[in-house]
Amino acid sequence: MTAGQPLRDDPQPRRHSPPALHPAVVPAYPPPESDADESWVWSQIKAEARRDADAEPALASFLYATVLSHPSLDRSLAFHLANKLCSSTLLSTLLYDLFVASLAAHPTLRAAVVADLLAARSRDPACVGFSHCLLNYKGFLAIQAQRVAHVLWAQDRRALALALQSRVAEVFAVDIHPAAAIGKGVLLDHATGVVIGETAVIGDNVSILHHVTLGGTGKAVGDRHPKIGDGVLIGAGATILGNVRIGAGAKIGAGSLVLIDVPPRTTAVGNPARLLGGKKGDDMPGESMDHTSFIQQWSDYSI
């Protein structure tokens, strides 16, 4: 989807519809490569929060505490995550300090936050604003928490990293091992039931639907989980097992079981999955979110 493209094609005007609070057009935005991009996204989030607080007084206190009282996107995210993941024995103040320190020390984490927000806003027609994703998208929140846990894992603070993993699984129903490496511009759409194993690697601009498993094949140790290339789309309920490689721009059909490598720009569909050819001119499915062209366009030949 390109910037400025309508989220929905709705040529027939709907009668008796209340006026929309959110525009149905994704605003033009720069690529998330600089502090200016982070500032722009943060300004959009604050504007949306002010608008929503005015429109819905019941949410005003929540929006002020979570967004409007904070000086930056990373502070707002840290506060929100800390309050989502805290428990009676894992205090929100401890988690807030942990998230703030991690985001401050690792600019790549902040860049990934912005890229993930842009990904959700541009790829998901149900995403009505950046603030909606920041506050309500559990897939987005689970990824940000996992990135902090990944930093802790690399620092050999593994007990705390695993405690974060456990809380994310309990709160969001998303189970991502702290050692898994996740790129930027990643969308976990719906996210419920997503499981990503210890040695999994996920590239940039990947989209993953709910109930997806990137798992091992049994009790083997070592490098045993899938490697997902850039721009891959993994449909709902798909399972990919073992140290297999899913090439850049590949597509995994909903409900498929993948046990073999999938070449770049190729679709895998079925249980067990078979490979269908791709076309060099196709959009990257992880960005276009085209779930069905493997049936409509590529079913005329197979590899």
Curated annotation (Swiss-Prot):
An example of a Gene Ontology BP annotation on this entry?
A: cysteine biosynthetic process from serine
Q: How does it assemble?
A: Homomultimer.
Listed under catalytic activity are: L-serine + acetyl-CoA = O-acetyl-L-serine + CoA
PROSITE patterns membership: HEXAPEP_TRANSFERASES (PS00101)
The EC number of this protein is 2.3.1.30
Q: What is one term from the GO cellular component aspect held by the record?
A: cytosol
Intrachain S-S bonds: none
Q: A Pfam family name for this chain?
A: SATase_N
List the protein's name.
Probable serine acetyltransferase 1
Native organism is Oryza sativa subsp. japonica
What are the record keywords, sorted?
Answer: Acyltransferase, Amino-acid biosynthesis, Transferase
Q: Which residues lie within the region annotated Disordered?
A: 1-36, 271-290
Asked if the keyword Zinc-finger belongs to this entry, the reply reads no
Q: Which SUPFAM superfamilies does the entry link to?
A: Trimeric LpxA-like enzymes
State the similarity comment.
Answer: Belongs to the transferase hexapeptide repeat family.
> Quick check: keyword Acyltransferase in the entry?
yes
Q: Which gene encodes it?
A: SAT1
Which pathway does it take part in? Amino-acid biosynthesis; L-cysteine biosynthesis; L-cysteine from L-serine: step 1/2
Signal peptide location: none
- InterPro entries (alphabetical): Hexapep, Hexapep_transf_CS, LbH_SAT, Ser_AcTrfase_N, Ser_AcTrfase_N_sf, Ser_O-AcTrfase, Serine_acetyltransferase, Trimer_LpxA-like_sf
- Gene Ontology MF term list: serine O-acetyltransferase activity
